């Protein structure tokens, strides 16, 4: 048992969680991983992977029992994200995005909203978190989508881009600005939009470098009328909802990245144990041992921090934003480094599509960009040490 396997074995899973993780690993190895190259090539949505995940009831793990769920720990959720992402990064994003979108509804929705909307998610529905716009990426306060109250309804107008699951979802958590509130931050609000609502359209999907089977869509809202009952909290509460949600979704992005990192690391180790040069296996050369040692050490440290942040979130620690940013930053940078090094370790083979490290290198890049670019996370972390000047 190597150090990564010992780290996994040390996690205090319950018997139920252990059984579920075993089932997820089996599904990932036997069905999801063998399909990954096909979906990367065709960029088709992996409906069979989603069906298999739903057959295990995985959506139910982050939904309370009162709404049809079977909740397990946040750490177990992160472990499932990592296992699925190691097999297929696209499928990992699809499933993790469900959590990203459903979590605001669970944390901030009222009882009527939860009773009405969560059971269909527990049964396997798809959801999307809708934030980014052409003029509002890292600075979400620049969004232009508007919510205008009209009696018992809200009229939504605007557009969104780069929305994961945007072309396939049943529910959308949409952020925009309340027309009757001034201020870029103060006006941000959040609503639930259901598939098929008149005036809502999908205007296109992106042809991406990596995670090609995960749909990334552009959305348009033209006089979309939704019930006032679909407003989360009160008008102007959107920024609070958004920031709280990101603190829980960023560790999920880190787990996704660590799945990619694990896949690339394992492929590189297998190749270097098998490939011979000058009468030796590659991993018998000291220089490559040093390379592997550095990657393994960083992987162990980042995964240890993953479980630490999960523990903080499960204990309802009041301030985990910087911890989540550190995790997202280090996990995603490491995924890109390990995937790039794996291509180098495999030489010419690593550059060919017959070996999945080529795909993993492309898949890893998005992890440094979405859920806050790593430049933004560095700014957040650095700024947290800035002391207020005394006046």
Predicted regions and their residues:
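A short, Trp-centered hydrophobic/proline-enriched beta-strand micro-motif
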Residues: 123-132, 175
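Short beta-strand-to-turn element immediately C-terminal to the catalytic PLP-Schiff-base lysine
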Residues: 107-109, 148, 174-177, 192-194, ...
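Flexible, small-/acidic-enriched active-site or ligand-binding loops
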Residues: 142-144, 196-227
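Alpha-helical interface subdomain recognition
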Residues: 1-91, 108-112, 124, 149-154, ...
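Long, acidic (Asp/Glu-rich), low-complexity accessory segments flanking structured domains
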Residues: 222-241
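Hydrophobic, small-residue-rich alpha-helical packing segments that form membrane-like cores
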Residues: 136-139, 143, 154, 161-163, ...
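A short core secondary-structure module
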Residues: 157-202
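Short Gly/Pro-enriched turn/cap motifs at secondary-structure boundaries
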Residues: 135-138, 162-165, 181-182, 208-215
């Amino acid at each position: 048992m190597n150090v990564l396997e010992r780290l996994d074995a040390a996690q205090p899973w319950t018997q139920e969680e252990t059984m579920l993780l075993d089932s997820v690993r089996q599904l990932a190895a036997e069905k999801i991983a063998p399909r990954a190259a096909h979906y990367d090539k065709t960029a088709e949505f992996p409906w069979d992977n989603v069906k298999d995940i739903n057959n295990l009831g995985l959506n139910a793990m982050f939904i309370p029992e009162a709404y049809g769920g079977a909740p397990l720990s946040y750490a177990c959720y992160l472990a499932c994200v990592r296992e699925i992402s190691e097999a297929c990064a696209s499928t990992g994003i699809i499933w993790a995005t469900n959590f990203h979108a459903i979590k605001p509804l669970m944390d901030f929705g009222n009882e009527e909203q939860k009773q009405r909307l969560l059971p269909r998610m527990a049964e396997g529905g798809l959801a999307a978190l809708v934030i980014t716009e052409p003029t509002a990426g890292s600075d979400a306060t620049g969004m232009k989508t508007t919510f205008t109250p009209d009696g018992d309804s809200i009229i939504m107008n605007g557009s969104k881009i780069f929305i994961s699951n945007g072309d396939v979802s049943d529910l959308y958590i949409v952020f925009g600005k309340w027309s009757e509130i001034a201020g870029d931050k103060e006006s941000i609000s959040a609503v639930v939009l259901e598939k098929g609502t008149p005036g809502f359209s999908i205007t296109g999907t992106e042809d991406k470098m990596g995670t090609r089977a995960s749909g990334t869509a552009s959305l348009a809202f033209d006089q979309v009328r939704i019930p006032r009952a679909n407003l989360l909290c009160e008008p102007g509460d959107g920024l609070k909802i958004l920031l709280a949600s990101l603190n829980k979704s960023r560790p999920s992005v880190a787990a996704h990245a660590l799945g990619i990192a694990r896949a690339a690391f394992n492929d590189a180790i297998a190749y270097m144990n098998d490939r011979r040069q000058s009468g030796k296996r590659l991993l018998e050369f000291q220089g490559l041992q040093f390379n592997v040692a550095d990657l393994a050490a960083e992987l162990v440290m980042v995964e240890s921090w993953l479980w630490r942040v999960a523990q903080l979130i499960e204990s309802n620690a009041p301030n985990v934003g910087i911890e989540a940013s550190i995790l997202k930053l280090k996990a995603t940078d490491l995924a890109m480094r390990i995937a790039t090094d794996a291509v180098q370790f495999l030489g010419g083979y690593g550059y060919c599509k017959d070996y999945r490290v080529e795909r993993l290198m492309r898949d890893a890049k998005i992890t440094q960009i979405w859920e806050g670019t790593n430049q933004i996370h560095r700014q957040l972390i650095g700024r947290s040490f800035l002391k207020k000047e005394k006046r």
